[in-house]
Amino acid sequence: RGGKRMSFSSDLKMELSQINNLKNKQEVYAEFLGYLASNNIDVKGRNVKFSTESEYNINRFAKLLNNLEIKDYKINITGKTYSITYKCDEIPVLEDAENYLQQDNLKKAYIRGNFLGAGSINNPRNKYHLEIIFKDKECAEFTLKLLNEYSIGAKILEKTVYLKDGEEISKMLALVGGHSTVLKFEEIRVLREMKNNVNRIVNCETANLNKTINAAVKQA
């Protein structure tokens, strides 16, 4: 980190990038499919390019490629953006994901890949908002369906799946394996709710006091 303050989103991506499941080939492939459904994947002919501003994320994607025996890739750095490019004879499509994701752990790995691919989360001190941008509406609708299976009330706008409720975001973070981030998020959420409740009580007390004063003035 070198003393540089990271965003809430970057912290979450760092945590997810360090999940130690790379020996499980099925989960690796499911997460890889999740990345491929995201908006930050660019396909030109046989060339596939993934771009991100997270160093941890680019390393994670490279590890997935290594595990899948895709060794011929190049990593480039332009300004703040990291990109990785590789060649692929047969690029997986959404139908492959639909057929492959039969088990619970694979569905979770896929959604984690979605978020690492093109997801972001606001600092909950400011507002509750998590979103993932997909390459097309079909991919967005598929992930929306998966989230509904886990009773996570996400919404969709064109090719973006988003959450605006604190409790739903917490469930989503836990689902994809962001356990440290869940604890941070919940701590901020509880403090925020307490502050809102205190403000509500103070406003209510102030309003009642004003009514009492006004009534007393009228009677005087």
Model-derived features: positions:
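Short, mixed-charge, low-aromatic patches
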Residues: M14-L22, D96-D104, N197-I201
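Extended mid-to-C-terminal alpha-helical interaction segments
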Residues: G177-A220
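Alpha-helical structural motif
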Residues: F8, L12, V28, N57, ...
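Short, Lys/Arg-enriched N-terminal segments with co-localized hydrophobic residues
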Residues: R1-R5
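DNA-contacting interfaces and partner/effector-binding or oligomerization modules
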Residues: E31, S38-R189
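Helix N-terminus capping/helix-initiation residues
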Residues: N24, S54, D165, N208-L209
